[in-house]
Every structure is written in structure tokens, then in C-alpha cells.
């Protein structure tokens, strides 16, 4: 199967120009930005410069059901379709500490549009003020779509808080912009391979 390299380059280039907020493209030290915005901007620039198109072969023996690679260092999620016609690269949020980070092989076992959310017992222990349940909606931390992994409590999901993307900001899950999880949701299937490195 011939891989459409033009499409790959276009998707990656489009992502780089469209998903970088305007303030991230401006002068970091301008008087118009707050200290927090300056730090976020520096982080996004560093992360964006580390995005590289990857070949799937060093990570997977095949592309049966498609494959997702999450790189914790570059804070990027790579997706390859089973027929190799589609390769997408998305910025992501990753766990905020090594304690919350799980690495290894898993797979998508369930797909949910409009997911509800229940914090894990350890989340409630760390944050007793959090609700025990949250229905789908704009306050839901899982965003608009969720891919449930075979590991208990682990998901690839959207987020309504776009400040989290490109940062170590999650409690263990991998977060994407809602627009990106919507696209990834449509491309993946139950059984899609997942590797977190």
C-alpha cells in the first residue's frame, strides 16, 4: 500500500498552524501577556518543536485495527490507520506526575460519545471536594468523547479546558482537544492497539 506522504505532511503542517493559539505565536515576553501565559507559551513552543512524524514499525509489529502511540516526553499522540492511508499527530496532555503515569501496551475496549465521569478513589482522596459523579456536559473533564482502555480508569478523552493540552496536567489519562478526540474517535475502533511510552 502506497502511503500518501502529501496528506501526512499537510495534516502535520495544518495542525502546527491551526492548533497553536494566537498568543503562543506571539512574543513570549510582551507586556500584554501574564506570567502564566508566558509559561504556557514557552511550554507549547517547546512541545511543538519536538513533534516529529514517526514510522509505526519500531513500535508495533502490525497495524491490525489501527494503532495509537502516546509519547509522554513530546506530549503527542500518533495514530495510524490499519491500511496506512491515515497518519495523524495530535498534541496531548499527559499525567502530571510519574506516579500517575502508566506505560506499556493496551487497547481500546470501549468508545463513548458524551461520557459521564466518576473520579477514581485515589482522585477523591487527593481532592475530596470533587463530585462523585458528573454527567456529560461542558463541566465534564472527559470532554465530548472518550476511548476507554483495557487498563482500569485509563482513557484517551477530550477536554473542555484547552489550557491542559501540551502540559503535564492529567490524573493519568491522555487528553486531546475536543475537535481532535472527535476525529480520533471516528477513526478508531474497539481493538485499536495503544502503546504509551
Protein language model annotation of sequence segments:
Residues 1-2, 68, 172:
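Short N-terminal micro-motifs specific to bacterial/archaeal maturation
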Residues 1-17:
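N-terminal secretory signal peptides and thylakoid transit peptides that target proteins
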Residues 16, 74, 112, 153, ...:
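Short, flexible active-site-adjacent loop segments at beta-strand->alpha-helix junctions, enriched
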Residues 17-18, 84, 115, 180:
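Generic hydrophobic alpha-helical segments
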Residues 20-22:
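C-terminal segment of classical bacterial N-terminal signal peptides
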Residues 24-26:
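Boundary at the C-terminal end of the N-terminal hydrophobic targeting segment
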Residues 28-122, 135-138, 145:
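Cell wall/extracellular polymer interaction/catalysis modules
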Residues 63, 96-99, 103-104, 116-197:
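Exported/periplasmic cell-wall-interacting domains
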Amino acid at each position: 500500500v502506497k502511503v500518501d506522504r502529501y496528506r501526512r505532511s499537510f495534516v502535520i503542517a495544518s495542525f502546527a498552524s491551526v492548533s497553536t493559539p494566537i498568543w503562543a505565536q506571539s512574543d513570549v515576553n510582551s507586556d500584554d501577556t501574564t506570567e502564566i501565559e508566558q509559561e504556557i507559551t514557552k511550554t507549547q513552543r517547546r512541545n511543538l518543536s519536538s513533534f516529529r512524524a514517526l514510522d509505526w514499525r519500531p513500535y508495533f509489529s502490525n497495524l491490525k485495527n489501527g494503532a495509537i502511540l502516546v509519547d509522554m516526553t513530546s506530549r503527542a499522540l500518533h495514530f495510524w490507520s490499519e491500511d496506512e492511508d491515515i497518519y495523524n499527530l495530535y498534541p496531548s496532555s499527559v499525567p502530571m506526575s510519574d506516579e500517575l503515569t502508566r506505560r506499556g501496551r493496551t487497547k481500546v475496549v470501549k468508545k463513548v460519545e458524551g461520557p459521564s465521569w466518576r473520579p477514581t478513589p485515589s482522585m477523591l482522596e487527593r481532592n475530596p471536594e470533587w463530585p462523585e459523579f458528573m454527567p456529560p456536559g461542558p463541566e465534564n473533564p472527559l470532554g465530548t468523547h472518550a476511548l476507554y482502555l483495557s487498563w482500569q480508569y485509563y482513557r484517551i478523552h477530550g477536554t473542555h479546558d484547552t489550557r491542559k493540552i501540551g502540559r503535564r496536567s492529567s490524573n493519568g489519562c491522555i487528553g486531546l482537544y475536543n475537535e481532535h478526540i472527535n476525529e480520533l474517535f471516528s477513526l478508531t475502533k474497539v481493538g485499536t492497539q495503544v502503546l504509551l511510552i
